[in-house]
């Protein structure tokens, strides 16, 4: 399977990027073609987006590890691109049950949701 990892930096050690790198390494061991970009004409089978979907032209799995809810910030504006990605996703993977409940409270429920914690080792 050809998998596009969207909105990720494999060289970063931050939370979502670190998780993405471990997941990529595991998928590569299973002989999947995993990249953060594909050349024109090379069509991935699915996109795995981290927090925000930047490539909405193919089937998409969105991995969410949180949303903004701090009332001292304009959390509605900060959440808007996340909310749009959440609603458009074919499947959503949450980092935790807390994250799922918080997201559903602010954005509503969608179909095809799963919880996969960070322990991917």
Region roles according to the model:
Residues 104, 119-121:
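Acidic anion/phosphate-binding donor-loop and adjacent secondary structure
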Residues 75-92:
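Membrane-proximal helix-turn-helix segments that form the acceptor-binding/catalytic region
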Residues 46-73:
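Active-site proximal beta-strand in glycosyltransferases
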Residues 98, 116-119:
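Carbohydrate-associated surface elements
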Residues 4-6, 63, 116:
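Short hydrophobic segments within beta-strands
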Residues 31, 42-46, 58, 88-90, ...:
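Short, well-ordered alpha-helix to beta-strand connector turns
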Residues 1-44:
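N-terminal pre-catalytic "stem/leader" segment of glycosyltransferase-like enzymes
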Residues 49, 94-95, 115:
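Short beta-strand scaffold positions
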